[in-house]
Every structure is written in structure tokens, then in C-alpha cells.
């Protein structure tokens, strides 16, 4: 990552620097202390570090796709100086294929999914790994059950793809989710 990209992140309106010591230039750690949920934190990083996303809304990852779509529609320019691209196909399987296609063109691609959506895109995930494509699959981990759908936390999404060949990084909190997201690119 170049120095100009790092400067853009910290000078962006996304990270307004307010508080004691800012006016005097005595900020020890640049950035903002803010309370946001995990989806918001991930999108703050993704929309700066990625070029394109293919996603189909599924709870609890729906917000990430919505926030990305809003940023793309508003003409947001990422740190590479590129406008964001968003594709919302007809299902999760197609979303994985779209994301793979975006990665094949050389774009920094991302996908947002969880639960049954991960299970549905399973075949496409193996194909992406087989082609050695690099993209980030942001998972809002949730449990999958046989009897009813639920949105309770769980690691079933992880176990669904643990043998697919994806590197999987787990965050213990919201800050770690943002940090690991940028590291994964």
C-alpha cells in the first residue's frame, strides 16, 4: 500500500479526526473512536480497499451489501482511485460466480454472505479456489439448523467451507474484523 493511499484513508471524511489534541496536531493514533457494529466496520474498510463486490442479501450480512451498494451508487472512489462496482445477482450461487468473475478481471473483489447462502454457493467456492482467485468472502457467522431457519450466532458457515481451500480469519471483536479485513486484501 503506497503512502498516498494511507494518507487518503486518514484524510477521508470516512475517518474524521476530532477530539482533544487534534487541533494541536498531537494525535498519537490517527483515526476515530466510534461505536459501530461489525457490518459497518467491515464496509468502512472494504469500500476503501476493494474495487468490486458481488453479493446477494442474506441476514445478518445484508447490511454489508446494502452499504456497499449505497457507496457504489453515490460514486464513492476507493484508495486506488477507482469507482466502486456492485453486482446483485439472483442468488448466492450466482453471487459467488460474479465475485469470481470480478477477481478474474484483476479487480480487488469482495462478497458478503452467511448461513444458508454460504451452503448454496459451496460449489462456486471450490471453483474459485481451484482457479486460485483472490477475493474476500465476508461472513456474518450464523448457525444453520435442519428444522427451521434462524439467525443465531454459530460457526456452521465456517464448517460448511472449511475444506474448500479458503483462508479463514476470525475476528474476536469489531476492531479485529476491520483490521483482519484489510489484512486479507
Please annotate each region the language model reported:
Residues 2-160, 165:
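Thiamine diphosphate
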Residues 151-185:
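Conserved thiamine diphosphate
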Amino acid at each position: 500500500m503506497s503512502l498516498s493511499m494511507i494518507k487518503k484513508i486518514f484524510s477521508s471524511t470516512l475517518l474524521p479526526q476530532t477530539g482533544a489534541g487534534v487541533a494541536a496536531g498531537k494525535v498519537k493514533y490517527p483515526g476515530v473512536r466510534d461505536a459501530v457494529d461489525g457490518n459497518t466496520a467491515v464496509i468502512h474498510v472494504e469500500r476503501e480497499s476493494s474495487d468490486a463486490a458481488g453479493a446477494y442479501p442474506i441476514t445478518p450480512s445484508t447490511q454489508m451489501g446494502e452499504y456497499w451498494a449505497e457507496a457504489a451508487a453515490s460514486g464513492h472512489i476507493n484508495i486506488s482511485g477507482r469507482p466502486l462496482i456492485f453486482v446483485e445477482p439472483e442468488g448466492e450461487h450466482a453471487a459467488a460466480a460474479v465475485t469470481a468473475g470480478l477477481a478474474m478481471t484483476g479487480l480487488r473483489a469482495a462478497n458478503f454472505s452467511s448461513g444458508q447462502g454460504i451452503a448454496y454457493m459451496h460449489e462456486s467456492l471450490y471453483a474459485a479456489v481451484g482457479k486460485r482467485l483472490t477475493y474476500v468472502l465476508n461472513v456474518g457467522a450464523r448457525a444453520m439448523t435442519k428444522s427451521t431457519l434462524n439467525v443465531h450466532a454459530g460457526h456452521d458457515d465456517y464448517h460448511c467451507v472449511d475444506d474448500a481451500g479458503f483462508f479463514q480469519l476470525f475476528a474476536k471483536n469489531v476492531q479485529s474484523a476491520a483490521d483482519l479485513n484489510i489484512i486479507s486484501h
